[in-house]
Regions:
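Cysteine-centered catalytic environments shared across enzyme families
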Residues: 1-289, 302-305
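Glycine-rich active-site loop/lid subdomains used to bind and stabilize high-energy intermediates
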Residues: 4, 26, 106, 265, ...
Length: 386
């Protein structure tokens, strides 16, 4: 039994029909996906229909390349494929796990679902026992991280498909296959540092622009940090050429609240955000202060809407308001600086140098520290004490 709560982010997906049954080949296919390399994929597959939905395009990729077709895809996706004649079921998630998909094998029946609702409705309380290992690991971790053990969920018999993996269930046997390992990617070698910089900028620009399809309203979370500012600085001029607006959202503190913080903490980032906004005439900025609210104000609503226990409840109020407002304005894609600490700005200097030393890049660690101290006029003694 296949079902799909259809949601669409792009014009091509508006009239998409999922699940899809290929009657000629007797293959069942369903997807939750938005592809980044759509033009390149269409060219490889010799498809000229500009309106083909991402899901159907992905199915053509499966027909062309078979089980490992996801190696040719880029984007946020999950797929389920059932081939009755071969008694084979395949379940995929994307390279970094943007699209979560959960599954559980009960006897000879395999259940899968994006959320946990299916398991709550179909399983008894005995089958849906809480995972003490998952809960203990999350509680012992001081950060907001909820992924101590990849693949585990709050329920013992329910598992989450790991990033860059797919499962294959055939002839009563379940196997898990990893289709991508970043450590094994071919390294790029240039003579000059400027060549690396140019490649980073080109890649980053393409990643942002590929999301901005015509006919979609775009929103973006914008702080004064490097991650979200960089994304907005690419998206805004690109949209301006098409005569389109970029809605930006910034969380600011309630004026009535008195913040006590050290000199390095900036509770209100609006002044720096306004400087960024002033550079782009097509940005319409929105500042969210959640006046009179706190993390407990809408707790009942949040508990109903969130599948998992969470630890970053302090951010829920403004995240909910931003999403609600963006949706009301017809925005279907929202850009964020998520994961930027590990890919763009590298977070704070202590995290960066700790990572460099752990991976034995000692010269890089020393250079990073020296550059940071010089640029920010921080005494070496103070830094070492920190």
């Amino acid at each position: 039994y296949f079902a799909c709560g259809h949601q669409y982010f792009t014009p091509e997906a508006v009239h998409e029909i999922l699940p899809y049954h290929d009657k000629e080949r007797n293959i069942f296919f369903t997807a939750d996906c938005i592809l980044d390399n759509r033009p390149e994929l269409m060219q490889e597959l010799h498809i000229t229909d500009a309106d083909i939905p991402d899901g159907l395009l992905s199915y053509h990729a499966y027909l062309t390349w078979g089980e490992r077709f996801v190696e040719h895809l880029l984007g946020a996706f999950s797929f389920a494929i059932y081939v009755p004649d071969a008694d084979t079921f395949l379940l995929y998630t994307d390279h970094v796990g943007n699209r979560c998909i959960n599954y559980s094998l009960q006897g000879q029946t395999l259940y899968f679902c994006t959320t946990y609702d299916l398991f709550k409705e179909c399983f008894s309380s005995e089958q849906l026992k809480l995972s003490e290992k998952w809960i203990t690991a999350c509680e012992s971790e001081p950060s907001a991280c909820m992924l101590a053990f990849p693949g585990l969920t709050p329920f013992e018999e329910v598992f989450q498909l790991k990033a860059a993996h797919y499962i294959k269930y055939t002839n009563g046997k379940l196997s898990e296959i990893q289709y991508w390992k970043p450590q094994k990617c071919k390294k790029i070698h240039y003579r000059e540092e400027e060549q690396y910089k140019d490649l980073v900028v080109q890649t980053f620009r393409k990643c942002v622009e590929d999301l901005l399809r015509p006919g979609t309203q775009i929103a973006a979370n914008l702080s004064s940090g490097l991650d979200s500012t960089s994304i907005v600085s690419i998206a805004a001029p690109f949209l301006e050429k098409r005569g389109e607006i970029l809605h930006t959202y910034t969380s600011i503190p309630d004026e009535a609240h008195d913040y006590e913080s050290d000199a390095y903490f900036v509770p209100d980032e609006s002044s720096a955000v306004k400087k960024t906004v002033a550079c782009f005439p097509n940005i319409k900025s929105h500042f969210i202060d959640c006046k009179g609210e706190n993390a407990l104000t809408h707790l009942k609503k949040f508990v109903e809407e969130y599948d998992l226990p969470i630890k970053s409840a302090i951010n829920l109020s403004w995240i909910y308001q931003v999403n609600h407002d963006a949706h009301a304005r017809g925005c279907t894609i929202q850009l964020t600086g998520q994961m930027g600490n590990g890919t763009l700005s590298y977070g704070d200097i202590l995290s960066l140098t700790y990572h460099q030393m752990r991976t034995f890049h000692l010269i890089q660690a020393k250079q990073s520290i020296c550059d940071f101290l010089k640029k920010n006029h921080v005494p070496k003694k103070y830094f070492l004490h920190t």
